[in-house]
C-alpha cells in the first residue's frame, strides 16, 4: 500500500507541476502518457499485478528491471529538486508536498520533486515515442526512462521554461488587445486540463498584468483627448481675439466715416444757408399773399381754437425748416465730457435763439395778414403819409407806439396763449367790432400829433378798448416785443442799411418791406422771451398797472439809450446778436481784399454784432465758402485754357472784360455797385497761373495738390479799408 500511495502522489505532483508551468499539450497524448506511466509504476510496486494494472500496462517488464526503473526515477527527482526551486510556479506546490510528506512520517521524501516536466522535453519525448520504430519499452515508457541528465539538458530546460512564459505573456497581451476571451474559448482542451485551484500569487500576478495595459491605454487616450480639447480651446480663444480686433477696427472706420460725412454735410449746409434763407422768406411772403387774398368774412369767422391751431401749425413748419441749423450746434459740443457745462449752455442758447426765430417769423406772418386789410379797405381815409421823427419819441412815450405794441401783444398772445386765459365765456368780436377798433390801431395824423407824450391815463384807457384784447381776455403784461416797429410795416432802414425817413404807404404794406430775416429779429425775440420768463401773465393786474409794466420793461431794455432811433441794428451804439444780409454783402466785398481773415479782424470790422462762438463760426464759414467758389472757378478756367491750347502762363491774364472776372464779380458783387480793386485782379491772375502750372505738371493726381496753392494765396491778402469798420459802410461806399 505505501508503494501504491507514493505512486499516486507522484502522478498528482507531476500533473500539477505541468499545469503550473503552463505548457500546452494535447489531451490524447498526455492521457496515454500518464496511463503508461501509471501502469509502469503499479507494476513495479506490485509484483503480483492485478487486472487493473494489466489494463493500463502496455509493455510487460521483467521482475529484475522494475527496481532499476524506480531507482532511476527517484535519483533523477532528487537531482532536479534544487534546480526547480527557483521557479515561481514550483515554490508553493513543493512546500505543500513537503508538508504532506512530513505528515506521512517522512517516508520516501524523494518523491516530492519527481514530477518535474517541461514543455519542450515532454513534447519531444511524445514525438519520439510516437514516431520511433524501436520497440524498446524504456524510451516510450516515461520521461524519466533516459539516463542521467547533463548540465546542457538543465540549461535547455530553463530556456524552454522562459520561452514558454514569454509566449504565455505575449498570448495574454494579444488577447487583451483584441478579445480577452478568444484564447480561452478557442482552446477548450487547455481549459479542461488547467486545474480550478490556482495559487493566489499566480492569480494576483495575472490580474496585475491584465490591468496594467488597459490603464496605460486609457491614460494615453485621456491625455490625447485633453490635448485635443486644449488645442480647440486655444483656437477658439485666438478666433475670439481676432473677432474683437476686427470689431474695433470696424468701429474706428465707422467713426472716421461719420466724421468725414458730417464735415461734408456741414459744408453743404453752409453753402445752402443763404439760399435757404431766401427760400424761407419767399415762402413766408407767399403765405402772406395767400392770406391777404382771403375775404374779411372768412377771417372774421375764425373762432379762437382754429386761430390758435393755425398759428401752431405755422410754428411747426418753421421749426422743421430750422432743423439743420440746430444740428450744427451739437456737432461742435460733443467733443469731450469735461467741457459739458459751458458747451451745454451754448447749446441751450442756440436752441433758444432758433425757437425765438421761428416764433418771430410766425408773428410777422400773422401781423402782415391783419395789417394788410386796412390798407386795402380804407385807402381814401388813410393816404400815404410821411413817417415823422416824432414817432420815435424819447422812451417810447408815443400814442401810436403803444397802440402798435398793444396790437402786437394781442397777436403774440394768440400764438402763445396764457393757460389762465379762457375762450369759452367770451365770444370773438364780429366784423363790425373790428371795423370800429381799427382807428385805434393804425390811425395817425402827422399834423396834429404832439411831440410830447400824453398823460399815461389817457392812452391807457384807449389802448384797452381794443376788442381783440379786452374781449378775448388777453393780458397786456405778456409783452412780446419791445421794439415791434419793423413788424408794423415801418422798417428801420432801407435796403442799403441807412435809416429811412419816409416810405409811402403802398411800400409799407408790400411783402418786400415786411420781409425780416432770422438775424434781424433774434434780438427782439430774445428780449421778449426774457420778459415772459421773469414777468408771467397775471389776471390780477389791472390794465393801467399792466401797461405801466410794459413801459418799464421797454425802459429797462433800452438802458441808457435816450432816443428810440438808436435802436437801429446798424447804429454804432446798438449791438446785434445775429447776422443780416447786409453783413453778408459786407463780407463779400471784404473778400476782394482778404481771403483768409482772422477772428480778430472779423470782430474789428463787424463791430455792430455781439460776437459769440456761433457768430464767429458763421463768419468764418462764409469766407470758407467764398474761397471754395473762388478756387473752383480758377481750376475750371485753368483746365479750359489747357484744352484751348494755351502752353505758357504768360498767355493767361485777367481783365475786367474776361469771362472769369464777370463770374467772380457776379458772385461777390451782384449789384455791380462796388468797384473791384485792381489788387484783386492781380491776385486772381496769380491764382489762375498757379492752377495752370500745377495741372500741366501733373500734380493734380495728388489728393492734396491744392494745399501748395493755398499757401501762396494766403500771403497775398491786402489791407481792408477803414471804411469797412463802420456799421453803415455800405451806404458810404455807394455814395462815394
Swiss-Prot record:
Please report the stretch or stretches of sequence annotated as the Prospero-type homeo domain. 576-634
Q: Where is this region: Homeo-Prospero?
A: 576-734
**Expression across tissues:** Expressed most actively in the developing lens and midgut and at lower levels in the developing brain, heart, muscle and retina.
Which keywords fit this entry according to its UniProt record?
A: Biological rhythms, Developmental protein, DNA-binding, Homeobox, Nucleus, Repressor, Transcription, Transcription regulation
Q: List where Low complexity composition bias occurs.
A: 450-460
What Gene Ontology terms describe what this protein does at the molecular function level? DNA-binding transcription factor activity, RNA polymerase II-specific; RNA polymerase II cis-regulatory region sequence-specific DNA binding
Report biased composition (Acidic residues) as residue ranges.
264-274
* GO cellular component term, pick one: nucleus
Motif Nuclear localization signal: which ranges? 163-168
Q: Which InterPro entries match?
A: Homeo_prospero_dom, Homeo_prospero_dom_sf, Homeodomain-like_sf, Prospero_homeodomain
Localization (cell)? Nucleus
Q: Where is the composition biased (Polar residues)?
A: 103-135
Sequence ranges assigned to domain Prospero in this UniProt record: 635-734
A GO BP term here is: dorsal spinal cord development
The record's function comment reads: Transcription factor which may be involved in developmental processes such as cell fate determination, gene transcriptional regulation and progenitor cell regulation in a number of organs. May be essential in the development and function of the eye. May play a role in the regulation of the circadian rhythm by repressing the expression of clock genes.
Domain annotation text? The Prospero-type homeodomain and the adjacent Prospero domain act as a single structural unit, the Homeo-Prospero domain.
Task: Report the sequence similarity comment from the record.
Answer: Belongs to the Prospero homeodomain family.
> What name goes with this protein?
Prospero homeobox protein 1
Q: Quick one: which gene encodes this?
A: PROX1
Amino acid at each position: 500500500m505505501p508503494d501504491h500511495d507514493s505512486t499516486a502522489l507522484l502522478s498528482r505532483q507531476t500533473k500539477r507541476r505541468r499545469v503550473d508551468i503552463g505548457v500546452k499539450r494535447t489531451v490524447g497524448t498526455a492521457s496515454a502518457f500518464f496511463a503508461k506511466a501509471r501502469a509502469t509504476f503499479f507494476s513495479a510496486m506490485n509484483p503480483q499485478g492485478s487486472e487493473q494494472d494489466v489494463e493500463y500496462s502496455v509493455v510487460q517488464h521483467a521482475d529484475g528491471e522494475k527496481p532499476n526503473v524506480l531507482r532511476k526515477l527517484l535519483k533523477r527527482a532528487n537531482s532536479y529538486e534544487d534546480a526547480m526551486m527557483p521557479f515561481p510556479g514550483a515554490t508553493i506546490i513543493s512546500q505543500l508536498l513537503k508538508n504532506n510528506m512530513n505528515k506521512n512520517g517522512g517516508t520516501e521524501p524523494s518523491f516530492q520533486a519527481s514530477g518535474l516536466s517541461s514543455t519542450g522535453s515532454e513534447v519531444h519525448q511524445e514525438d519520439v515515442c510516437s514516431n520511433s520504430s524501436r520497440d524498446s519499452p524504456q524510451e516510450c515508457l516515461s520521461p524519466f526512462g533516459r539516463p542521467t541528465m547533463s548540465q546542457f539538458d538543465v540549461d535547455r530546460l530553463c530556456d524552454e521554461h522562459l520561452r514558454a512564459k514569454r509566449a504565455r505573456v505575449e498570448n495574454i497581451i494579444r488577447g487583451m488587445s483584441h478579445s480577452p476571451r478568444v484564447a480561452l474559448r478557442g482552446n477548450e482542451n487547455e481549459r479542461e486540463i488547467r486545474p480550478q485551484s490556482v495559487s493566489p500569487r499566480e492569480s494576483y500576478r495575472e490580474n496585475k498584468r491584465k490591468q496594467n495595459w488597459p490603464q496605460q491605454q486609457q491614460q494615453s487616450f485621456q491625455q490625447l483627448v485633453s490635448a485635443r480639447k486644449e488645442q480647440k480651446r486655444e483656437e477658439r480663444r485666438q478666433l475670439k481675439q481676432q473677432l474683437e480686433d476686427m470689431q474695433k477696427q470696424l468701429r474706428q472706420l465707422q467713426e472716421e466715416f461719420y466724421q468725414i460725412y458730417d464735415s461734408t454735410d456741414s459744408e453743404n449746409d453752409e453753402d445752402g444757408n443763404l439760399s435757404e434763407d431766401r427760400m424761407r422768406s419767399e415762402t413766408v411772403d407767399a403765405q402772406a399773399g395767400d392770406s391777404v387774398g382771403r375775404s374779411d368774412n372768412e377771417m372774421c369767422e375764425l373762432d379762437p381754437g382754429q386761430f390758435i391751431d393755425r398759428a401752431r401749425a405755422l410754428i411747426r413748419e418753421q421749426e422743421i425748416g430750422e432743423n439743420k441749423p440746430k444740428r450744427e450746434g451739437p456737432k461742435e459740443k460733443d467733443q469731450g465730457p469735461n467741457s459739458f457745462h459751458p458747451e451745454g449752455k451754448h447749446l441751450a442758447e442756440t436752441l433758444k435763439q432758433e425757437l425765438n426765430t421761428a416764433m418771430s417769423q410766425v408773428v410777422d406772418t400773422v401781423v402782415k395778414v391783419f395789417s394788410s386789410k386796412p390798407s386795402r379797405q380804407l385807402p381814401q381815409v388813410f393816404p400815404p403819409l410821411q413817417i415823422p421823427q416824432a414817432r420815435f419819441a424819447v422812451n417810447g412815450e408815443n400814442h401810436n407806439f403803444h397802440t402798435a405794441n398793444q396790437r402786437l401783444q394781442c397777436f403774440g398772445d394768440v400764438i402763445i396763449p396764457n393757460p389762465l386765459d379762457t375762450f369759452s365765456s367770451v365770444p370773438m368780436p364780429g366784423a363790425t367790432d373790428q371795423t370800429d377798433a381799427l382807428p385805434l390801431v393804425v390811425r395817425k395824423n402827422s399834423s396834429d400829433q404832439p411831440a410830447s407824450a400824453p398823460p399815461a391815463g389817457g392812452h391807457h384807457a384807449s389802448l384797452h378798448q381794443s376788442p381783440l384784447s379786452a374781449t378775448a381776455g388777453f393780458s397786456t403784461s405778456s409783452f412780446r416785443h419791445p421794439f415791434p416797429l419793423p413788424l408794423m410795416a415801418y422798417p428801420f432802414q432801407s435796403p442799403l442799411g441807412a435809416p429811412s425817413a419816409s416810405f409811402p404807404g403802398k411800400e409799407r404794406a408790400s411783402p418786400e418791406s415786411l420781409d425780416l430775416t432770422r438775424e434781424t429779429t433774434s434780438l427782439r425775440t430774445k428780449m421778449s422771451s426774457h420778459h415772459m420768463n421773469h414777468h408771467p401773465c397775471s389776471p390780477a393786474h389791472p390794465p393801467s398797472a399792466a401797461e405801466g409794466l410794459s413801459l418799464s420793461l421797454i425802459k429797462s431794455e433800452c438802458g441808457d439809450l435816450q432816443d428810440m432811433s438808436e435802436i437801429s441794428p446798424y447804429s454804432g451804439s446798438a449791438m446785434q446778436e445775429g447776422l443780416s444780409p447786409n453783413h453778408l454783402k459786407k463780407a463779400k466785398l471784404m473778400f476782394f481784399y482778404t481771403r483768409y481773415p482772422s477772428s480778430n479782424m472779423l470782430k474789428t470790422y463787424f463791430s455792430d454784432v455781439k460776437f459769440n462762438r456761433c457768430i464767429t463760426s458763421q463768419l468764418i464759414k462764409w469766407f470758407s465758402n467764398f474761397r471754395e467758389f473762388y478756387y473752383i472757378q480758377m481750376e475750371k478756367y485753368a483746365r479750359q485754357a489747357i484744352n484751348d491750347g494755351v502752353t505758357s502762363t504768360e498767355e493767361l491774364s485777367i481783365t475786367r472784360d474776361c469771362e472769369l472776372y464777370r463770374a467772380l464779380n457776379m458772385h461777390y458783387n451782384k449789384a455791380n455797385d462796388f468797384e473791384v480793386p485792381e489788387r484783386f485782379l492781380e491776385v486772381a491772375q496769380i491764382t489762375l497761373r498757379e492752377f495752370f502750372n500745377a495741372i500741366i505738371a501733373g500734380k493734380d493726381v495728388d489728393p492734396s495738390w491744392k494745399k501748395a496753392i493755398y499757401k501762396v494765396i494766403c500771403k497775398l491778402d491786402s489791407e481792408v479799408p477803414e471804411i469797412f469798420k463802420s456799421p453803415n459802410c455800405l451806404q458810404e461806399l455807394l455814395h462815394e
